[in-house]
Amino acid sequence: ICKPVRIGSFQRMMSMPKLTYFNLTGLGEPIRLMLAYGNIKYEDYRISKEEWAAMKAGLEWPHLPMLEIEGKTLFQSMAICRYLARQLNLNGRSNWAETQIDMTVDALNDFRAKVASYYYLPDGEEREKKKAVVLSEVLPLYLDRLEKQVANNKGYLVVGKLTYADIIFLSFIEYISYMLDKAILEKHPKLKEHHQRLKSLPGIESWLKT
C-alpha cells in the first residue's frame, strides 16, 4: 500500500486550509479524498444554496469547489486536484507522464459528465431511455479502456504508480455507481481490485467511513 507523502510548503502551513463546496460529493469529493490521503487537516465547509447565492458575486470566479490555502484562493476542481497532486507526490515525473495523467483525468471527467447528463434529466421517461444507452454504450466504452490501462500500468491507471488520476477514479466510480444505482465494476476484475485497494489507502479508508 502506498504511504501518503507530504512535501514542500504543506510542511510549513500556518493556517488551516478551507474547502468550500455543497453538502454532496460531486466535484468536491476528489479534493476531500486527496486531503484525506495527505493527512491534511482542513475545514470542510458545506455551504447552502442560499449562502452561495449571496457569496458568489464577490468572488474572483463564481465557481465551487473553492480551496483557500496558504493565503491563496483556488477555483476549478481539477486545477485544485493538480495543485494538491504536486504537493503530495501524486503527479507525474516527466512532461509525458503528466500528459498521460491529464488524458486519463479528462476521460474520467467525460465519463462522469455523460452519466450525469442522463441522471439530471427532468423527464422520467426520457431519463430511462438515456439510462439504457449509458448502460449499453457508455459504460463499456470507458470501463473496457480503463481496465486495459490498469492491466498495463502495474495495477494503476497510468505511469505505473499512484497518481491523482487514481483518486479521481475512486471518487467518480462511487458517484457514477450512485447515479446508476448499480455496481458497475463487476465485469472488470482489475478495475474492481484497484477500486478496493484505493478504498483501503491510509487516510482515505477512514474518510470513507465518516
Predicted regions and their residues:
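Structural helix-adjacent loops and short alpha-helical linkers that scaffold large soluble proteins
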Residues: 92-95, 181-188
